[in-house]
């Protein structure tokens, strides 16, 4: 059994980002940055509660805000997932691949990704109902799902889930800790950037546009980095023959 090394995984993630940035940067721009900026500029404006609003009014306002934002958030999530799959394909393809082939592969995988999303949502939901600890554990055990299906060209989502479970055996908590620490760092930085750009101006102003560009650029960079982290986790745990060494 390979013991997961967080430091080595982080170094490998940085190597992946630097080595392939000209190609993956374009994909990150198309699938991470553009959908994000489109949602920010074309999506519904934030709803502001009236002065002296009651808790019920605020709750109603929040639900309405969520309802309006949901289609945009769904579109951004779909685009981000497609982009991640295409980037993973470029990084993990056994015989090398082109950007066009990687994009085609990502679109072919849409049915598989939909089923994966539903199954994982159900599993995480059940785990969260039991206790938060099982849900955190599943983060580590399913971290290799998307790199696995991308590398091995798996169309069966259940094969990807079981493959990730086997691959991360004995390392679930280490991987979960690594991913959670990484996500906390991204969340803190995102909140800081958002707080700074939030003072640029209200929705519809020129300052808001500049702030949205900055926020979307940061989100795109983090999306690329998150994809690299998943790839690095998989690269460290996957075992290949001598003729199939990762480049």
Region spans (language model):
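Hydrophobic alpha-helical membrane segments
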Residues: 1-247
């Amino acid at each position: 059994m390979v013991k997961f090394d967080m430091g080595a995984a982080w170094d490998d993630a940085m190597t992946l980002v630097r080595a392939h940035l000209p190609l993956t940067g374009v994909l990150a721009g198309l699938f991470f940055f553009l959908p994000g900026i489109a949602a920010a500029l074309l999506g519904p404006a934030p709803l502001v509660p009236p002065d002296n609003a009651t808790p019920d009014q605020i709750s109603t306002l929040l639900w309405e805000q969520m309802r309006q934002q949901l289609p945009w958030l769904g579109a951004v999530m779909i685009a981000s997932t497609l982009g991640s799959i295409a980037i993973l394909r470029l990084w993990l393809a056994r015989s090398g691949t082109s950007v066009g082939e990687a994009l085609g592969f990502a679109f072919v995988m849409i049915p598989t990704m939909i089923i994966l999303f539903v199954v994982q949502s159900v599993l995480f939901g059940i785990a969260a109902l039991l206790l938060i600890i099982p849900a955190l554990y599943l983060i580590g055990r399913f971290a290799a799902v998307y790199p696995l299906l991308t590398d091995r060209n798996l169309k069966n989502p259940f094969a990807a889930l079981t493959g990730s479970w086997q691959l991360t055996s004995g390392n679930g908590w280490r991987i979960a800790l690594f991913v959670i620490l990484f996500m906390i760092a991204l969340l803190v930085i995102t909140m800081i950037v958002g707080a700074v750009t939030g003072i640029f101006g209200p929705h519809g102003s020129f300052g808001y546009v500049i702030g949205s560009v900055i926020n979307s650029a940061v989100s795109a960079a983090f999306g690329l980095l998150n994809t690299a982290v998943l790839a690095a986790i998989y690269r460290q745990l996957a075992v290949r023959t001598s003729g199939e060494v990762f480049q």
